[in-house]
């Protein structure tokens, strides 16, 4: 791992995804926008599967939502390493989610524990 390293994923959420989330979470959601927890799940996916990857422990996530994400529109979530603390096995990352036109939907940061920080 190194500072500046990043990964991205792009996906859209459908009305069916929204219905399943609403049923699972027993949540009231607007019918035409992606719920914020689903956007947060994109960051969780990237951190746990790609960077740092398997064995990562999620310690903290801060998200600031700047705009709503419409259904059926591609969203690109990105996590980028901003700081490495190998002595504590900690990795700080910037997180962003954008629409295809570049509109910033969400920005924030994450802190994870990763045993192979110094590798």
Predicted ranges, named:
Residues 52-84:
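Mid-chain, well-packed structural core segment of small domains
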Residues 1-56, 60, 118-119:
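Hot-dog-fold acyl-thioester-processing enzymes
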Residues 2-5, 71-119:
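HotDog/MaoC-like acyl-thioester-processing domains
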């Amino acid at each position: 791992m190194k500072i500046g390293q990043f990964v991205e994923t792009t996906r859209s959420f459908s009305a069916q995804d929204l219905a399943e989330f609403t049923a699972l979470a027993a949540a009231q959601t607007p019918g035409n926008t992606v719920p914020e927890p689903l956007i947060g799940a994109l960051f969780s996916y990237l951190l746990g599967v790609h960077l740092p990857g398997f064995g990562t422990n999620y310690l903290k996530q801060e998200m600031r939502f700047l705009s709503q994400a419409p259904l059926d529109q591609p969203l690109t979530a990105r996590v980028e390493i901003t700081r490495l603390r190998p002595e504590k096995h900690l990795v700080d990352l910037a997180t962003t989610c954008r629409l295809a036109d570049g509109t910033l939907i969400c920005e924030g940061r994450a802190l994870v524990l990763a045993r192979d920080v110094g590798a």
